[in-house]
């Protein structure tokens, strides 16, 4: 994702913000090498707040865990304010620092050229999905052959988020394919979705849900069973991306998503696909 953003033509600024879980852990040790390779500013909320959680008020504690966290993984409003303060502190430090890095001075290159050189180096984690594209009802790939079978409805009960500076909620993946066996009994006779295309990697994005009227779907590639997509494993409404295959070369494949026989009277939503040619 970082490489994808850094390669965008409008050259957006990138900051890596490492939040923290209630067990005083995050992924900064695993992911910070990405920031170091591309010389990106990084903010660690863990480093900012976790050391003071164990202190008493008269020892310098600023905020308690109960005040900072809304649940195990998400900050409260007060916690988000602390995170905003951390980012603001980063901007203050940047304003105080010189604009040219030592590397840029020693190499005689602009920071933009150094970044481009680093992007040409081997990635520290991977870049298998750097050029991934979305496939849904709106963003259709001309060489993808789709038989939607019984997936002829559109799900409107979707995970929604605030986008950019908008406070109103925007549904994610609105151009989806939904199988609805609760209303249309004819769908139960064609409880499948088929996609044929040539690509190197393919991801399925489906909707997780805790509703009782949601069922499972089995995923087949070229007639071979691969896995079952079960919305109840996570059991709350959100988007779940899973890898169907990730190969070294691009080949033609037929992917069939078939509603489990015992769940033909329920619903299942394909939010979209991600593909790499």
Feature locations, PLM:
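Extended, polar beta-sheet/loop recognition surfaces of beta-rich domains
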Residues: 264-277
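Glycan-recognition and processing domains
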Residues: 96-199, 203-210
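Alpha-helical cap/lid subdomain in secreted, periplasmic
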Residues: 1-104, 170, 177-203, 207-254, ...
